[in-house]
């Protein structure tokens, strides 16, 4: 039995100051034209905050910060949502707040920022989480600026100096592509890694090769829905149901006389579970969907084997082990180790290939020691590529056992927080000790986090 290495114990000496996870909760994840998007983004965070604060009895003034992640910080998700959520949840005004953005890893970054603040001694407790309303504010909505000449919003282009970065320029030339977003990268990434593992050139990727690859991607997608549909009861333990307004005949949310969401079936519906999983989907249905990018002979990505646009929020409470003991609160988990890495910004979405081995190396552990392995399903080509490179079988029962983003959705500001919290619930249910999660990140980054259950059987 190998001896695991805790990042806290390696660099800090006081066991009473080790950050511990006290509690975690999330909203159901809403789908396109679903119910969750009818809320303000900050109200979804407040819903999670209030749930945590109501079921954990302690003096809330001990909280040193409120940290909320969001990818598209626009509308009510702007204006420092970390601070606004804290005030909206009626935390003492002495509790400050800030917002963070690391694209698809934003939720994990919010948690790790809180962990780091506690570990270094800057504060004793934090409340943190993430939010995204993709069906209201699409990815990159915050990059649009109104152009007066054209009379419409235009997206601000990336700085041209990025393209002259020698490493970026070399990769753009190698893959004969442009720096033009995640869907394009998911397409190029898939062709690159499939060709690599088949021993062919990227130009040879067509015909039977393309057909075989797409079939495997659709199978990954089907597995995600099947697992998600069979684990509603497991995921229910991490979800706090939320009342969502019904729509009137004009498609407007129906609110009460005070312009608030009513907890009343005449005006609202109680959303209790994730809206995305499709129990009736099949390989036949997935295979008939139109491809969304690439020449027809090389196209394989569809709406069915990519994550859908979605909405949701999640939150956690962290504090020192000593403070938890003083307050009579039971720690549920710790972060054993983690890694934050930068990777190729052109392929962009293969970050887990570097981040997960790095986190495991730091912990002196391997995938064999992990009871559960989560890789975010932004696109099925990401899952295929990362699994092949890491030697993981996507049919392994430890892999994304409760379904992934293809079925559940990927509210980018929330997902990382959800994955850490889901690992916690998986470990508690199974009585196991370690789990790892990771995700690809826009512009080539990744975070991998190893969760350690405080109470394994």
Residue ranges and their predicted role:
Residues 13, 130-132, 137-139, 183-188, ...:
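Conserved N-terminal phosphate-binding loop of PLP-dependent enzymes in the Aspartate aminotransferase
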Residues 38-126, 130-155, 239-271, 346, ...:
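Conserved beta-ketoacyl condensing-enzyme motif
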Residues 70-125, 177-184, 198-200, 280-308, ...:
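Conserved catalytic cysteine-centered active-site region
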Residues 8-11, 26-50, 54, 72-75, ...:
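Active-site pocket-shaping loop/turn-to-helix segments
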Residues 125-208:
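Flexible glycine-/small-residue-enriched beta->alpha junction loops
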Residues 50-64, 192-199, 206, 210, ...:
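Phosphate/pyrophosphate-binding loops at sites that engage ATP/ADP/AMP, CoA/4′-phosphopantetheine
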Residues 4-11, 17-20, 26-27, 37-47, ...:
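N-terminal extracellular/periplasmic Venus flytrap/periplasmic-binding protein-like
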């Amino acid at each position: 039995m190998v001896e695991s290495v805790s990042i806290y114990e390696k660099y800090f000496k006081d066991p009473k100051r080790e950050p511990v996870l006290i509690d975690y909760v999330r909203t159901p994840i809403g789908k396109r034209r679903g119910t969750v998007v009818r809320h303000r983004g900050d109200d979804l965070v407040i819903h999670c905050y209030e749930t945590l604060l109501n079921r954990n009895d302690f003096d809330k003034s001990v909280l040193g910060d409120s940290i909320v992640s969001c990818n598209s910080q626009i509308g009510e998700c702007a204006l420092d949502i970390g601070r606004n959520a804290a005030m909206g949840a009626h935390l003492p005004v002495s509790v400050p707040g800030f917002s963070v953005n690391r694209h698809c890893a934003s939720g994990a970054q919010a948690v790790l920022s809180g962990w780091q603040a506690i570990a270094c001694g800057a504060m004793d407790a934090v409340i943190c989480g993430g939010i995204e309303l993709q069906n209201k504010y699409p990815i990159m909505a915050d990059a649009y600026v109104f152009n007066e000449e054209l009379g419409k919003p235009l997206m601000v282009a990336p700085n041209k100096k990025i393209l002259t970065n020698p490493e970026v320029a070399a990769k753009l030339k190698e893959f004969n592509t442009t720096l033009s977003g995640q869907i394009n990268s998911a397409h190029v990434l898939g062709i690159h890694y499939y060709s690599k593992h088949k021993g062919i050139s990227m130009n040879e990727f067509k015909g039977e090769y393309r057909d075989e690859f797409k079939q495997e991607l659709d199978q990954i997608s089907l597995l995600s829905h099947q697992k998600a549909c069979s684990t509603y009861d497991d995921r229910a333990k991490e979800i706090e149901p939320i009342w969502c307004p019904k729509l009137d005949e004009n498609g407007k949310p129906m609110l009460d006389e005070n312009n608030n969401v009513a907890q009343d079936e005449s005006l609202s519906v109680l959303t209790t579970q994730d809206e995305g999983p499709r129990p009736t989907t099949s390989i036949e249905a997935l295979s008939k969907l139109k491809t969304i990018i690439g020449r027809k002979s090389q196209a394989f990505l569809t709406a069915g084997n990519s994550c859908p646009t979605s909405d949701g929020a999640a939150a956690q409470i962290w504090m020192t082990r000593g403070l938890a003991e003083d307050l009579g609160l039971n720690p549920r988990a710790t972060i054993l180790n983690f890694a934050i890495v930068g990777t190729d910004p052109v392929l962009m979405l293969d970050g887990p290939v570097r981040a997960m081995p790095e986190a495991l190396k730091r912990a002196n552990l391997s995938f064999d020691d992990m009871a559960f392995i989560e890789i975010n399903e932004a696109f099925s080509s990401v899952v295929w590529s990362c699994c092949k490179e890491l030697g993981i079988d996507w049919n392994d029962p430890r892999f994304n056992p409760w379904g992934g983003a293809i079925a559940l959705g990927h509210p980018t500001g929330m997902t990382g927080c959800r994955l850490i919290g889901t690992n916690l619930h998986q470990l508690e249910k199974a009585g196991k000790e370690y789990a790892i999660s990771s995700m690809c990140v826009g512009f080539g980054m990744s975070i991998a986090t190893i969760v350690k259950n405080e109470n394994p059987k």
